[in-house]
Amino acid sequence: MPSSDVCKAGSHRHSGWIQSLKKPGPFNLDAPENPEETLKSAFSSKILIIGAGGLGCEILKDLALSGFRDLSVIDMDTIDITNLNRQFLFNESNIDEPKANVAASMIMKRIPSTVVTPFYGKIQDKTIEFYKEFKLIICGLDSVEARRWINSTLVAIAKTGDLIPLVDGGSEGLKGQARVIIPTITSCYECSLDMLTPKISYPICTLANTPRLPEHCVEWAYLLEWPRVFLNASVDSFSKQEVFEPLDGKNSNFEPDNIRHIDWLVKRSIERANKFQIPSSSINRFFVQGIVKRIIPAVASTNAIIAASCCNEALKILTESNPFLDNYMMYVGEDGAYTYTFNLEKRSDCPVCGVLSEVYDISASSTVTLKDILNHYSKSYNLQNPSVSTAAGTPLYLASPPALQVATSKNLSQPILSITSVDVNLVITDKNLSTSLSVQLREC
């Protein structure tokens, strides 16, 4: 849609947003003077989507249909035939092409008003300046390592004065989660690493001597038997020992996408199961490949729900029309549709966003303002442009971006006890601080 035609109240599909922005409400006490410009500014914001897989495709579609016109997407993968059942922006003719390129092309073809810039490669290969270009980043990743990297990068950027909100989505079968991370203000991804489910592993002694499950038999064939038979074997030795066709290539490294290799594991796993009187009816190509590739079945409906939540948070953050998620939403779809929202607390000992600590004594009748407190610590810590929130993640004053600075600046002149209470921890961030500064308000 042309930028001049973003908002025509009453006739445009975004007229509902215009009306909601015009009217003050319990979460929108100060309606913008010019809601059309507010919406235009939000829809013109540069947004980066990390990941163009099942969740990333849904996020791209939702953002484009919502009206966002300046999107970028980065992904290091190419399209595989197994992606086509749920990653709807791709088809068979796109196999082996970069996901980011094809996804961007398809979105712009179907929604010409949206410009999507693709980047094919690793997020780690981009510079800090690249990420500073965006007002919001949304993750649709399936990698813990990648999430940790972008989280620490955005925290580092925040410490230089540029605050870029991160909306993180994830899905696993019929379960999913969405969370909002305001770097250095709310808990970061690193704060909640202990919540992650540990990878399933089996003791080698169980696999070698006392298998009890079909999974044990598959792991034995994959981890112990394959290396024993083929570690230094030639292609010829493989064809002599087995009824299957020879390995492709010049070595005998296991390839989980090579159906001949999978068939070999199926055969050996069934033999192992029969030897130990373990039911083997479930051992087939799909079962074996799922174990060796650590595949968690992807469900399209879960991706759609989580993507919708992520895009809803993007709308709330960029239009400031409602409070954004505070700060974690979990979804469970195994027995109906269940969601639960709670606040993940910021860890003071977090290696990425951990805090310094101070105590500020204050009386119940004190008229000390938020600005007075910031000035007090600006002297001792040489702060230049500090932001402050409660430890629970409620922003009191954000120095950047400009829209949030304007929205929260009125709190500076307010008595601190009129906007929070004693025994509350304040979290101050500034580019001159190596980490966040925690200030406990203590009644004296």
Swiss-Prot record:
- Gene3D superfamilies registered for this protein in UniProt: NAD(P)-binding Rossmann-like Domain (3.40.50.720), Ubiquitin activating enzymes (Uba3). Chain: B, domain 2 (1.10.10.520), Ubiquitin-like 2 activating enzyme e1b. Chain: B, domain 3 (3.10.290.20)
Q: Which residues bind ATP?
A: 54-78
MF terms (GO), sorted A to Z: ATP binding; ATP hydrolysis activity; NEDD8 activating enzyme activity
CDD domains recorded for this chain? Uba3_RUB (cd01488)
- Which parts form a coiled-coil structure per UniProt? none
Q: Which reaction does it catalyse?
A: ATP + [NEDD8 protein] + [E1 NEDD8-activating enzyme]-L-cysteine = AMP + diphosphate + [E1 NEDD8-activating enzyme]-S-[NEDD8 protein]-yl-L-cysteine
**Is Nucleotide-binding one of the keywords?**
yes
EC class, as a word, reads ligase
Q: Which GO terms describe its biological process?
A: protein neddylation
Pathway, according to UniProt? Protein modification; protein neddylation
Which key words tag this protein in UniProt? ATP-binding, Ligase, Nucleotide-binding, Ubl conjugation pathway
Q: Which domain of life is it from?
A: Eukaryota
User: Known SMART domains for this protein?
Assistant: E2_bind (SM01181)
Enzyme Commission number: 6.2.1.64
Return the Pfam families for the record. E2_bind, ThiF
GO cellular component terms listed in the entry, alphabetical order? cytoplasm; cytosol; nucleus
Q: Which residues form the signal peptide?
A: none
InterPro entries xref list: E2-binding, ThiF/MoeB/HesA, ThiF_NAD_FAD-bd, Ub_act_enz_dom_a_sf, Uba3_N, Ubiquitin-activating_enz, UBQ-activ_enz_E1_Cys_AS
* Active site: residue positions: C205
Q: Could you say which protein family the record assigns here?
A: Belongs to the ubiquitin-activating E1 family. UBA3 subfamily.
The cross-references to PANTHER family, in alphabetical order and at most eight, read: NEDD8-ACTIVATING ENZYME E1 CATALYTIC SUBUNIT, UBIQUITIN-ACTIVATING ENZYME E1
Instruction: Outline the subunit composition.
Output: Heterodimer of uba3 and ula1. Interacts with NEDD8 and ubc12. Interacts with but1 and but2.
Q: What does this protein do?
A: Catalytic subunit of the dimeric uba3-ula1 E1 enzyme. E1 activates NEDD8/ubl1 by first adenylating its C-terminal glycine residue with ATP, thereafter linking this residue to the side chain of the catalytic cysteine, yielding a NEDD8-uba3 thioester and free AMP. E1 finally transfers NEDD8 to the catalytic cysteine of ubc12.
What name appears for this protein in its UniProt entry? NEDD8-activating enzyme E1 catalytic subunit
Q: Which gene encodes it?
A: uba3
